[in-house]
């Protein structure tokens, strides 16, 4: 059972959602299984679900980082690498965040999935 699903994050830590308004990221845990069931009940729609790591890698985040960092200093490259790792590492944001595509069943679009 999910509870306390509306959350605020400030400086990489959970914070009170009503404090520091405008300087916190607000997130919400979604019950994707329920969401898929609702979409399926509508009819004519299809869903794809993956984690943030797979999605970002499939849309080329590593290649993009390589292109951007080509003319950067070592320190900037290292910083970019650490940021990229945070986004795609399974122990950080890579498996924590999910991406869902809802599309018409006849649509073959699957970029990132």
Predicted ranges, named:
Residues 1-113:
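Long, Lys/Arg- and hydrophobic-enriched amphipathic alpha-helices
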């Amino acid at each position: 059972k999910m509870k306390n699903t509306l959350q605020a994050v400030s400086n990489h830590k959970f914070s009170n959602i009503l404090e520091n308004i405008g300087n916190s990221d607000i997130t919400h845990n979604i019950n994707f299984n329920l969401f898929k069931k609702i979409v399926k009940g509508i009819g004519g729609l299809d869903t794809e679900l993956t984690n943030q790591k797979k999605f970002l890698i499939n849309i080329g985040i590593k290649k993009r980082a390589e292109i951007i960092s080509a003319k950067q200093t070592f320190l900037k490259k290292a910083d970019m690498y650490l940021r990229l790792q945070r986004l795609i590492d399974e122990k950080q944001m890579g498996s924590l965040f999910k991406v869902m595509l809802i599309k018409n069943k006849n649509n073959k679009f699957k970029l990132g999935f």
